[in-house]
């Protein structure tokens, strides 16, 4: 069933508010802060419909709604506008990597650290030998989704054992250059609040994946073009 324009605008408003606050979004909030031009009752009815269609879900602890992975994917594919890196940021990032003139392994580690800083997330990368590079673990500790020690422990433990990266790689199809994954797709309960944006890089004898781990509500409009730029930059700098 295709969504109406009103439903699309409502879904966009709910998701962008959820990305901003990490809290379930109620009809009153949308009515006050979004210029949808409809009554609170209409907003509530449409939220019920979007829930029935699988785009939203209601938490046990709140009357508000949060997006499902289906809702987030629809937002990314159909509603979201990417926010490209500024030219100043692109130049600064490129200069920092080029000026180091490092061997590939050090450059990949350096790239991962800069990506973590740029996205305020946990950045990961692999090389052709399967070695894993990670940076920004402290970043996720500031996010409400990772206040749950069991979730954080699961992510860091699986990363340490390479299980998490193996699970992500297994989800990437051969023709895909960039993929958005949600924790529930990996079938691991403690990863359900997580989101992943990963891309491939390949040049000469070096290939692997590069990406970030964060909450499922991460700001994909910023993260996707950033991860894509880092992959393209890395491919151009591979020695």
Residue map of PLM features:
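Short alpha-helical segments that sit at the start of domains
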Residues: 1-12
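Alpha-helical hairpin
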Residues: 2-3, 38, 67, 85
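Residue-level marker of regulatory loop/turn positions in helix-turn-helix DNA-binding domains and
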Residues: 3, 23, 144
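Conserved RecA-like P-loop NTPase ATPase core
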Residues: 10, 68, 212
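N-terminal helix-turn-helix
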Residues: 13-20, 24-78
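Intrinsically disordered, acidic Ser/Thr/Pro-rich low-complexity regulatory segments
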Residues: 73, 80-239
